[in-house]
Amino acid sequence: MPNYENLSNTLTAQMEQERQSGNYIKTGFDDRNALRRRADDDDRITIWRPNFAHDIDRIIHCPYYNRYSDKTQVFSLIRNDDITRRSLHVQLVSRIARTIGGALNLNLDLIEAIALGHDMGHTPFAHSGEVYLDELYHAHAGRHFNHSIHSIRVLDGIFPINISLQVLDGIACHNGEIELEEYTPVPLTSFEDFDAMIESCYLDK
């Protein structure tokens, strides 16, 4: 069985050599293939602002991003200044995701944008709050509430800030293994397919 905590000396030396020389195979998504709902001069790629860097900037400047700081991960019945808030959770997810992505030579800006936006639509009180809101929403509207799908509503509806399809898809699918018990990526090639997928998530839990 593979040991993912310790790499062989040969592989470690190879990775170190590739890192120092900059000569390694890039397996990450190519920025030039990012899709957006509308063409915008503000999205032009420059040497210091690759495509997904625009998404990072737009997410952290979205008014709802500030709400991370006031949402706790759990509901506490006692005063606790050190209780974890969603802002710290998002920072940790971003850091861990970038570490893993860097080892795999993936697109780190794409990874960071997904990580920073992945809980934008989350309720307070962690998944218990989400479950309760889903029950209320479905009882009154016949539709389901899912925090990852609500994150899409925030970034693509409430604030239509032209986030790329690749980032939105990553946010929408970030907890698919919880709902489905497994996650098999399905490539998306258009916003039409993406919108149909999002609508199906409201109707089918």
Mark where each language-model region is.
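Sequence-structural signature of the catalytic-core scaffold of metal-dependent phosphohydrolases
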Residues: 2-44, 61-66, 95, 103, ...
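Alpha-helical phosphate/pyrophosphate-handling elements in metalloenzyme active cores
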Residues: 79-110
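Active-site flanking loop/helix segments enriched in acidic
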Residues: 40-47, 51-60, 66-88, 197
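Short alpha-helix carrying the canonical HExxH Zn2+-binding catalytic motif
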Residues: 112-117, 121
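Short amphipathic alpha-helical segments, especially helix-boundary/capping motifs
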Residues: 70-75, 106-111, 128-131
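Short secondary-structure transition/capping motifs
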Residues: 48, 82-90, 121-122, 140-144
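Residue-level signal for alpha-helical context at structural boundaries
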Residues: 74-77, 111, 151, 169
